[in-house]
Regions:
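Charged phosphate-binding loop/patch that engages nucleotide di/tri-phosphates or the phosphate backbone
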Residues: 154-165
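Short, glycine/charged-enriched secondary-structure capping and boundary segments
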Residues: 127-128, 145-147
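Structural signal for interior beta-strand "rungs" in well-ordered beta-sheet cores
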Residues: 6-8, 12-126, 130-131, 136-138
Length: 165
């Protein structure tokens, strides 16, 4: 794994965090407790800060970077090969595999960005919705079952990461 400073700013890593051997965490990155950073993920805080809340998972091949601060809430799942670039992702949200969330976009809490979707720069979406498409649009409101699924995904990754320690 690569954990290194950028211009004298070091990453801050919370308690009980799993970081895979092939992940890269650089510069102004703050990771909350019980998080997991999976294989080939790149968290590059050499532009603006990256802040990740508690119990969140950054899956294989994800890139977090940006010209604006990147904020990932608590209990968030960022799926394989997704890109979050200078955006805000609310608590209990799932970013699907291969999704792209661009600069200054805001995803409300308790939401899902469907796999392969593109959230364009500057878009703000309310909480509790399913976003889908290129460009991403609200398809429907989430059910309580959907929201519980998001929370279960985050919990599963906390539990799974503990098996790697």
């Amino acid at each position: 794994m690569v954990i290194r400073d950028f211009k004298g700013i070091n990453p801050e890593i919370g308690e009980n965090v799993f970081i895979s051997e092939t992940a890269s965490i650089i510069g102004d990155v703050k990771i909350g407790k019980n998080c997991s950073i999976w294989y080939n993920a790149v968290l590059r805080g050499d532009g603006e800060a990256i802040v990740i809340g508690d119990n969140s998972n950054i899956q294989d091949g994800v890139i977090l970077h940006g010209d604006y601060i990147t904020k990932i809430g608590n209990n968030v799942t960022v799926g394989h090969k997704a890109l979050v670039h200078g955006a805000t992702v609310g608590d209990n949200t799932l970013i699907g595999m291969g999704a792209i969330v661009l600069d200054n976009a805001v995803i409300g809490e308790n939401s899902i960005v469907a796999a392969g979707s593109v959230v364009t720069s500057g878009k703000t979406f309310p909480e509790g919705v399913l976003l889908m498409g290129i460009p991403a649009k609200v398809v429907r409101e989430l059910t309580e079952e959907d929201i519980e699924g998001n929370k279960s995904s985050a919990k599963w990754y906390v539990d799974t990461a503990n098996g790697y320690k």
